[in-house]
Amino acid sequence: SVVAAAPAGVEVIVADNGSTDDSLAALAAGFPSVTVLRMDRNYGFAGGYNRALEHIEADYYLLLNSDVETPEGWLAPILDCLDRNPDVAVAAPKLISCADRTEFEYAGAAGGFIDYLGYPFCRGRILRCVEKDRGQYDDERDVFWVSGAAFCCRADVFRALGGFDGDFFAHMEEIDLCWRMQLA
């Protein structure tokens, strides 16, 4: 769905984090226009993206998990938000569950906040209770962090802040980066 929904002029690049299955052969056969950046081993979410993005020159970095589905037209509002708001460093869509398209995705949903103890929580989920999507997060809104599952940021800000902290192999790296964006 990513290749089909990509606007003209957007290059789709897959960062292969040391896969050992036949996924790259399937990718090459099904999507020859996709560029693949291969890594020698799994560097984790943070390390893998940091290594891949060192080789990509762009105004924006759009990071998508491999299981994210993208409908037609989904990227335009995100890029428009960043274009209209030069002080916004990162933007993201709300994430709907693939298993139940009436509910938010468990991981990230619609961005989130940090409480006074430093605990991150997200819109669309309270602890283990996932909300139904009733349009309550269709608005453009400032949040403290967005999910790394679908993360669109200014490349210059990403580079200036040193990218993701590689000490986070997987999980919470996007919250850390968004926190550093807030402080910058």
Name each model-derived stretch:
Residues 1-9:
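Short, acidic, metal-binding catalytic loop of nucleotide-sugar glycosyltransferases
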Residues 61:
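Short aromatic/hydrophobic "clamp" motif used to bind/position activated sugar donors
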Residues 138-184:
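A short, conserved alpha-helix in the catalytic core of glycosyltransferases
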Residues 16-25, 41:
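A conserved acidic beta->alpha catalytic loop
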Residues 112-143:
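Short, flexible, basic/aromatic active-site loop/helix in glycosyltransferases
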Residues 43, 68-69, 88, 95, ...:
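Acidic metal-phosphate-binding loop of nucleotide-sugar-dependent transferases
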Residues 72-119:
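Conserved donor NDP-sugar-binding/catalytic core segment of glycosyltransferases
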Residues 39-56, 66:
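Glycine-rich, basic loop-to-helix element that forms the pyrophosphate-binding segment
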